[in-house]
Design a protein with these regions (language model features):
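Non-catalytic cap/lid and distal C-terminal segments of serine-dependent acyl enzymes
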Residues: 1-266
Length: 266
């Protein structure tokens, strides 16, 4: 692990540290006074730093939301590890390589034409990504993490990746927070296989908006919701829809306190 820089975020005590693991960049924040809770976030470019976010100036405001909810609940806020995706000018498909659920979206799986990668050299590497996250990054930054007090969060393809992580690494964390999970990359069969593989012991949050691409989500998300009920997740599962909410960091930040409360209030 090599440190790149440290910076401050308005409304957040202490510093965010930017480090590098080989070619992988990671931002992390550990609250003053310590904590035993850990939140692992995909698309780390968008978590703390408006200069690196997809939509300039828009971030998740994740630490601010975590501080607010934790104060409300009377607990120490969680540490946050924000893992950057791999997309660069040279590798525009890096994010997809990291986040596509490798064991479920194979070359034989139906993929909506809008999301197909034409490059024959494209190879999904999400298993490598999660191996690095759980076996290298987390132990180095937050070595005393426990599954019971660890959650993973992501949006869009990061939402699917979060659910995939629960399937592939159920022993590493126990709460999956998937905002605007991008089910429409495929079809009902893909969604069914993933839902049926989710560990029944985990808490799972899913949500969607009603603007932009999120308007396409209801049919498959409703299908997923029914499967989750049938599987017997009970109060360990919560699915919500938000008005005037789109497919961007600003929208997700507006209701981020709700999935965080779902996780932390237990």
């Amino acid at each position: 692990m090599q440190e790149i820089k440290r910076f401050q975020v308005r409304g957040v005590p202490g510093e965010v540290v930017r480090v590098q693991f080989g070619s992988r960049v990671v931002d992390y924040w550990i609250p003053k006074g310590g904590t035993d809770r850990l939140l692992i976030a995909h698309d780390g470019q968008n978590v703390f730093d408006g200069k690196t976010s997809t939509h300039r100036g828009q971030t998740w405001k994740m630490a601010q939301a975590a501080l607010h909810v934790s104060k409300e609940l009377g607990i120490n806020p969680p540490a946050i590890i924000a893992v950057w995706h791999s997309s660069t000018k040279e590798n525009r498909w890096g994010r997809a390589q990291d986040l596509v659920p490798q064991q479920f979206l194979t070359r034989d799986t139906y993929v909506d034409p809008r999301w197909r990668v034409a490059d024959p050299a494209f190879v999904v590497k999400s298993d490598e990504y999660f191996d690095q996250v759980f076996n290298t990054i987390v132990p180095e930054i937050f070595p005393h993490s426990t599954p019971e007090k660890t959650a993973v969060i992501g949006s869009s393809m990061g939402g699917l990746a979060t659910l995939y992580a629960a399937i592939a690494h159920p022993d590493k964390f126990t709460t999956a927070l998937a905002l605007s999970p991008h089910w429409i990359i495929s079809d009902q069969e893909f969604a069914r296989k993933m839902v049926e593989a989710l560990p029944i012991t985990h808490k799972v949050w899913m949500s969607r908006g009603n603007k932009g691409i999120d308007t396409e989500y209801p049919p498959l998300q409703d299908f997923v919701d029914q499967l989750m009920i049938t599987r017997g997740f009970g109060n360990r599962y919560l699915s919500k829809s938000y008005n005037r909410s789109g497919h961007n960091e600003r929208s997700w930040a507006k209701y981020l306190h709700e999935p965080l409360r779902f996780w932390l209030n237990s």
